[in-house]
Amino acid sequence: MAGASWRIVSAITIATVDPGSGLLHPARQVVSPNRDERPPGTLPELIVVHSISLPPDEYGGPWIDRLFTNTLPPNAPDVHPFFATVMNLQVSSHLLIRRDGEFVQYVPFHLRAWHAGASSYCGRERCNDFSIGIELEGSDERAYEPAQYRALSQAIHALCRAYPSLSPERVAGHSDIAPGRKTDPGPAFDWPRLRALLRLTHG
């Protein structure tokens, strides 16, 4: 049904995607300017799992929002030298999942976020064109939180219900679509755990 909202329910939260607006409930909405239209006729067919922490291995601050909205302050490198390497980037992701499972959405799912970079999936290049990017607040070597796995599985399920072009089998890591260039979500990410949760939620 066009414009319908699909939902999954758990004891913890409700994840709902409205395919009309491309928005996830209950995500906190933060508008990123780093977006554009997908190529005509292109639907989301892949979900890409990333990890991010700003500064590296530090969690809970405002810096991911600042990066994805191009509002890092000029003195950010004084806060941490790593910021000098990302000051001029224009990047985004559709969704961020914080350590406590909070959803933050930057780009509606029907639009193209700038998350994948040079990439290829099953021989098809330019993954930004046909993928949805989900960032987990974390790093390659540190275990992700149970709340993040629950939230990620719920988001994937809701996305698959809203966009039939997606499926739980078409979920890849950034390292899978950009091998040798990217390593996230890294060895700390428990893919079997995610697959088990997806079997429970997707059936």
Model-based region annotation:
Residues 2-125:
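N-terminal catalytic cores of peptidoglycan-degrading enzymes
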Residues 2-26, 40-41, 125, 130, ...:
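Basic/polar, cationic surfaces and motifs that engage anionic cell-wall
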Residues 134:
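Conserved, mostly hydrophobic/aromatic
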